Amino acid sequence: MNKFLNEKLMPVAAKIGSNKGMIAIRDGITLAMPLIIIGSLLMIIATGFAIPSLEAWLNDAGIAAYLWKGSDSSFGLIGLVASFGIAYSMTKQYGVDGVPSGIVSLSTFIVVTPFVTGEAGNGMPTTYMAAQGLFVAIILGLINGWVYQWFINHNIQIKMPESVPPAVSKSFSAILPGAALIVG
């Protein structure tokens, strides 16, 4: 059995593991790991470590509500962070600055998130920014990262003179790929 695994499955697994898209997904979701751990710890504490009397005390004292808010806030950003991280990682693998790509990916993620209207007002439900929107975040992160690097590597960008500070120049170089991704 080990021979079969080593000779047949390991080369396939190594090939899949070295794919740029898979690396970007791994790194992007790993970027959200602190939020996942913090949210999980707050959830464990809010439930009183599965001790009913401790859970009741936390609820009665009003502490559980704050813990749940922290947990929900942490888990509620996983999709957004993954979208940024996946685009960032994908772009970096092509030798391009990943931060603008990640920011554009955040914007496209918000563009595809449905808005709601009602008596309470207009807004964007946060449920899609959490794990419920993770699949969309993965797809958008991969597409944004690849398209962004393609624009930059094919010099489809606004070039500034050398006298312009590098941070400003990088911002201008992100305008064309960013606009194409956000509008497209």
Where are these regions (language model features)?
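Signature of multi-pass transmembrane helix bundles
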Residues: M1-I37, L42, I51-E55, N59, ...
